[in-house]
Regions:
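Alpha-helical scaffold segments that flank or form the walls of functional sites
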Residues: 1-34, 66-88, 118
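Active-site neighborhood of phospho(di)ester-bond hydrolases with catalytic His/Asp-centered motifs
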Residues: 4-5, 12-15, 39-41, 128-129, ...
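Metal-cofactor-binding active-site regions of metalloenzymes
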Residues: 4-9, 32-67
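Short, well-ordered coil/turn segments that N-cap beta-strands
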Residues: 8-10, 32-37, 87-88, 121-125, ...
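Short, solvent-exposed turn/loop segments enriched in Gly/Ser/Thr/Pro and often Arg
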Residues: 14-21, 44-45, 173-175
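Residues that line or immediately flank small-molecule/substrate-binding pockets and catalytic motifs
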Residues: 15-18, 42, 94, 152
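Active-site core of metal-dependent hydrolases
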Residues: 48, 93-190
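Active-site gating/metal-coordination segments in enzymes
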Residues: 55-114
Length: 190
C-alpha cells in the first residue's frame, strides 16, 4: 500500500526467498492486499562459484534467494520448476566474485546461459541476468537474455550485442551511487 501511495504502480522483484514474490503477487492480483502490479522471480540461479557472495554460497542446494545449479540438466530442471511455482522471470547470476580475482567474472558458460534462455522462452517466460562485467553483458545478450541487470563495465562490443539481440538494460544506478557515496565507509567496516 505504501508503494501505491508513493506513486509506484508496477515493479519487478527479480529473486525472492520462500516463494514470497509469487505469493504477494497473487494476493495483490486477487484483491486481498493493496499493492502495485508485481512481476517476480523465485530464487536466482547461481553456479557453485557463487554470485556476489563468493565462498559464502554453498556448492549445492538452496540458500536464501539463491538456487545453486551445477549442470545444464540442473539448469533446465530448475528453470522449469521456478516457472511451475509462479516465476514471471528467471534470474541468472551470470557473474560472481572469485577469491583472488578483482571484480566479478562470468561464471556461466554459453551453453548454460543458452539452456536457461531456451527453456524459459519455450514456456513464454523472459530471462534476466546479473551482469557486472563487459564479457557477461556481451555473452548474455548473444545467448538470449532479455534483460541485463547492472551492465557494469559494459564496453562497445557488449552494447552492440545488446542492440543486435534486442535485449534491454536495467543499469541500477542506485548501487553505483551508494558505492560512490558510502563505499569508503563500508570498506572501513569490512
Amino acid at each position: 500500500r505504501k508503494m501505491l501511495r508513493a506513486g509506484v504502480t508496477s515493479f519487478v522483484d527479480p529473486d525472492t526467498s520462500h516463494g514470497i514474490g509469487p505469493a504477494l503477487r497473487d494476493a495483490v492480483n486477487a484483491g486481498g492486499v493493496q499493492g502495485p502490479r508485481i512481476k517476480t522471480g523465485v530464487q536466482a540461479l547461481l553456479t557453485a562459484v557463487g554470485g556476489t557472495a563468493g565462498r559464502l554460497i554453498p556448492d549445492e542446494g538452496t540458500v536464501g534467494y539463491a538456487q545453486i545449479v551445477n549442470t545444464k540438466d540442473e539448469i533446465v530442471q530448475w528453470v522449469r520448476r521456478h516457472i511451475k511455482y509462479g516465476a514471471d522471470w528467471i534470474k541468472l547470476h551470470a557473474t560472481g566474485s572469485v577469491p583472488g580475482r578483482s571484480g566479478e567474472l562470468l561464471v556461466w558458460n554459453r551453453e548454460e546461459i543458452k539452456a536457461a534462455c531456451q527453456t524459459a522462452h519455450e514456456l513464454s517466460v523472459p530471462v534476466m541476468a546479473h551482469c557486472r562485467g563487459a564479457q557477461s553483458v556481451k555473452v548474455c545478450a548473444e545467448e538470449g537474455v532479455d534483460l541485463i541487470l547492472h551492465a557494469s563495465f559494459m564496453d562497445d562490443e557488449g552494447l552492440e550485442a545488446v542492440i543486435s539481440n534486442g535485449a534491454s538494460i536495467c543499469p541500477t544506478f542506485t548501487f553505483l551511487a551508494n558505492l560512490a557515496d558510502f563505499g569508503s565507509k563500508v570498506s572501513k567496516v569490512c
